[in-house]
Amino acid sequence: MKKNVIIIGAAGRDFHNFNTYFRGNKDYNVVAFTAEQIPGIDDRLYPKELAGKDLYPNGIRIYPESKLPELIKKFKVDECVFAYSDKPYSYVMGISAIVNAAGANFVLMGPKDTMVKSKKPVIAVGATRTGCGKSQTSRRIIEYLVGMGLKVVAVRHPMPYDPDLNKQTIQRFAEVADLKKQNCTIEEMEEYEPHVVTKRNVIYAGVDYEAILKGGMTKDPQTGK
């Protein structure tokens, strides 16, 4: 019997967990995403083209996180998967209590079910919260590796502000014109410009990391050819 699932997120890790584990998985029915942190992301749709047309022909609705208890009851949810960072332990466990009180299991997914393989060597740069300096550190690492004569690109967590998430499946920024072509917000431009202007480096972003690693960088990641 299928389990009904809600994925609790902020338009990043939540989509990734779905893509790598739940998409195409007939043992589960993801009835909704909930969202925080990204303005305007709630009350939108994770489109069928990304969700999988066979199991999710209408896509998956994204709701405000504040509606979580009523969504659990409405959709008879079995499990809620918490899938975003930048929150303290007290907040995460608070959501866990809300989920359990509404009658569902609270789940944190591990790396075995969510990591994707790359054909290229990877250096991961992470931090406990926003503003710790991941971007600056990444650019310094790229500078060092380029100095060694290596070809390097960056892959960044998406900032899915565009209402049509299909447009943000795979994004490639190699020059300033790409920022305009992708209709980047000011926040996105602040992130991508130092790579393409100052460092002359290519940066990838997008909703589907696996598609980026498998399709977006199958040949020369610098040229995209």
Segments the model singles out, each with a brief description of its role:
Residues 114-162:
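Walker A (P-loop) phosphate-binding motif
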Residues 47-112:
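Phosphate-bearing ligand-interacting subdomains
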Residues 30-31, 106, 150-152:
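Hydrophobic anchor at the start of a short beta-strand
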Residues 144-225:
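ATP-dependent carboxylate-amine ligase catalytic core
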Residues 3-24:
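Glycine-rich adenosine-cofactor-binding loop
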Residues 28-40, 155-156:
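Short internal beta-strands
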Residues 36-59, 163-168:
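N-terminal beta-loop-helix "entrance" segment that forms/cooperates
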